[in-house]
Amino acid sequence: MKKLKVLSVLGTRPEVIKLAPVFNEFFRQRGEILSCVVFTGQHQDMATVLLRQFGITPQYNLKIMRRNQSLADIVSRSVSRLSRIIVREKPHCVMVQGDTSTAFIAGLCAYYHKIPLAHVEAGLRTFDKNNPFPEEIHRRFISLLADFHFAPTPRAARNLAAEGIVKKSIYVTGNTVIDSLRVLESQSGTRKLPCFLTREVLSKKIILVTIHRRESFGQPLREVCTAIDRIVRLPEVEVVFPVHRNPQVRTQVRRLLRPRSNLHLVEPLEYKAFIDVMKHSYLVLTDSGGVQEEAPVFGKPVLVLRQISERPEGLDAGVSCLVERKAAAIVGCVRHLLDSPAAYKRMSRSRSLYGDGRAAERITAVLLRHKTMLQRKRNEKGKNMMPQVPEVSMSIVNNSNSMIRAETGSTV
C-alpha cells in the first residue's frame, strides 16, 4: 500500500526538540510513512545545531532569518515559499508543533491548500491574547485550522473542547519533550559535562537562568538582571545564564551584568549540555515554556518569570510558581528556597506532569489509523486543492536519499 506522506514544518529550537521524537517514530514506521521535513530557518543558527544533534536532515531550508526581522517579515517571506513546496510535494498531511510563527504560517498554508493539519502540543492557553505575544493568538488560530489536535495534557484537551473543537479530533498524547528527555537520559552516561561545571561550581547551589520572550524585553529584563546581580553576592550560589542570541536580550544583559567568578554568562548551550546543567541545578529561573515542562522531571523548582503561564499543571502541583518580574520579588523567592529546606522540599519533588515518554508513538499511531482516509481525501480533492504556481527550483544535496534542499532567493 502507498505510504502516508507527512510534511512537517519547523523553524525554531523548541520545535526541533519536540518533533525529533516524532521523526524517529516515523523512521521506525518508514514502511508506512514517508516523512518530508521543511525547515524555515526562523532560528537559523540555534536550530541548525540541534538539527545536526538529532540527526535530522530537512529536505528544504527556506533560510528566512534576517537581523532584526519583524513578525510580518517572517510571514511574508514564508507563505509563498512554503506554498510552492506543498504544491510540489502533495502531502497527505501537514504537521506543526506549538505556537511559533513557523507553525502558524504552515497551518495557514495547509488550510489554503485543503491539506489536513496535525497540531502537536495543541490546547495550551493563557486566555490573554497579548500574553504571550504573539504565541497565544498563533495557537488559537492553529486550533481553528487543525484536523488532528495532539494535546499534551487532559487540561489542554479540555481547553480545546471548551472552544468547540470536535472531541473525536482531540487526542491526549503527552508532550513529546518528555520523549526527548527520556532518550537523552539513556545517553547521559557517555557525555562530558560543560567545562564551566567544575568541581568547585558543582559543590555550590547552581541557579540556572533563561530568558528570551518578547514580553521580557526592556524593563522586565532590567529587573531580572538587577536580581541576578544581587543573587551572585551570595557566597553559596553559582549562577549559569546562557544568554539568548536575540540582540534585545544580549545587548541588555552585557550592559547590565559583568562576569564574576560565580556568574557564568555563557553562549546558548547545546540541548544535551543544557539538560546536564539543569540536572545539576538547585533551582531554575525562566520565562521559557519548555523549561517549565523539563525541570520538574528532574525535581528542580521553577520560578516562572511571567505574569501568567499556559502550563498550569506545574503551578497546581506546586513544583513551579509565578514570580513578578521585579528584582525584590525575584531575590525574595530565591532566598526563600535557599533558606527554607521545607519550602525547597515541597517544590523539588520529581514529577512527570507532561507525559510518559510515549507521545510520539501515540501521535504516529493516530495518523496511521487515519492513513486510508487521508490518502483518499487527497486523491478525491487533489486537482482542486493544488493551485497552479511556478515550479520551484531545487538542488539535490543527497542523491542516495533523494534529499532536496531549496535554494535561497526567489526560487522558494
Q: Over which residues does each language-model region extend?
A:
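Nucleotide-activated sugar donor-binding and catalytic core shared by glycosyltransferases
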Residues: 1-241, 246-399, 403-408, 412
